[in-house]
């Protein structure tokens, strides 16, 4: 069995935007999958809100305040935009608060409001990325994990997506961002970690790393 990551240690402070950058196969997505409970590490711990996530089933991590926007968007193509968004709120019970969150998501993503009854599979790539982000925000997360949000998008959509990530951060949500577009990620991050073959080889303030090429 290939070991994708080894000896990785990093921290994310509340309210930060943290970027994990590196080439394909560096282990970035594996880290996100491990943090969100999709993979179980052989050893080590992942602490969130004072609890070790390794000991908590993945499906319960969402209700603790963590949301994951997967690589490739992974929207439910045969469901409407609205149905996709409501899937993001499945751990929540208060209908009034869910409705308020939905309005906030629609304010942030006007295209989704316009297309709320449209099948998700008919949206453009950029719109599907917005939907995946909106779906994650419907869980009202404390931290949101984003995996390659710029993948396959036109430059215009990339700029729009990164503007929205900054808005999400400013609203108080912590962001852990995996991104191959290093310059774009570093331009909005507070701090960053650079991965090579499953190990962190560089870390520091994003502005310092951006100027360091």
Segments (PLM) and residue ranges:
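Conserved ABC ATPase signature
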Residues: 119-123, 127
């Amino acid at each position: 069995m290939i070991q994708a990551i080894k000896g990785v240690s990093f921290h994310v402070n509340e309210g930060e935007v943290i970027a994990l950058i590196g080439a394909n196969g560096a282990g970035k997505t594996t880290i996100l999958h491990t943090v969100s409970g999709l993979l179980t590490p052989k050893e080590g711990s992942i602490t969130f809100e004072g609890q070790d996530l390794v000991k908590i089933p993945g499906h319960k991590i969402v209700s603790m305040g963590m949301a994951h926007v997967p690589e490739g968007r992974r929207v439910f193509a045969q469901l409407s935009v609205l149905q996709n968004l409501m899937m993001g709120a499945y751990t929540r019970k208060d209908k009034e608060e869910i409705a308020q969150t939905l309005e906030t998501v629609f304010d942030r993503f006007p295209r989704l409001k316009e297309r709320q009854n449209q099948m998700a599979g008919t949206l453009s790539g950029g719109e599907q990325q917005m939907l995946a982000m909106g779906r994650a925000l419907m869980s009202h997360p404390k931290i949101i994990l984003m995996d390659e949000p710029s993948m396959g998008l036109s430059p215009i959509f990339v700029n729009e997506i990164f503007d929205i990530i900054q808005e999400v951060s400013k609203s108080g949500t912590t962001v852990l961002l995996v991104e191959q577009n290093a310059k774009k990620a570093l331009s909005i991050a507070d701090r960053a970690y650079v991965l090579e073959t499953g190990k962190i080889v560089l870390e520091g303030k994003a502005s310092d790393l951006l100027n360091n090429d």
